[in-house]
């Protein structure tokens, strides 16, 4: 799955962009605890399966 697709998924779930440090975008949710860190090394690149699963778990989508 591409970085842009993952970002679209978590934003549709209510997560919002807080800040960026280097190539890493950090998102928060108004209700769910914690943060989600999305590596953005070029939005058109595919994420590895493990990274994708980790992001979705952080967001509570998996």
Give residue spans per PLM region.
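Basic nucleic-acid-binding interfaces
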Residues: 2-19, 26-62
